[in-house]
Amino acid sequence: MGYTSGVGREAPTFVASAVDGSEINLKQYRGDWFAVLVFLPTQAASAETALAQLSGAADNLWGMRGQLLGICDASREECTTLAGKVADLAFPLLPDDGTIAQAYGALKPNGEVRAMTFIVDRAGKIVWMSEGDAALKPATLMTAFREVAR
């Protein structure tokens, strides 16, 4: 699967199992919900902090018909351990073997994941994306979400 994402393009679909056992199909959000995909490099020292901060934003997104999905570049066991370090994680955390990250252009040539966030609208189109530290900042995400969800 090659890099197929970008603002204005159809979001690559996927089905994945979250660490809580729920099955997530990106298509389930079409029609009523915006999906907010956050690619999180779990080896980064700030991964736990980013998850905790994003968890607070997830509740706000939910109230505006947005579902945050965390996508981790780690095994199920590693993702479960990371999720366990964040009290009351408010969004699904999905382990990824690189397949989803590659489809969204979040996979570096060395196999590591870039910190990236994508907002997918109700029609399944990517309407916003960010890369780097700003991609994991709740304030940046909430500002962008309010803008595109009008």
Task: Indicate where each model-derived feature is located.
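Thiol-/selenol-based redox modules, centered on thioredoxin-like
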Residues: 112-150
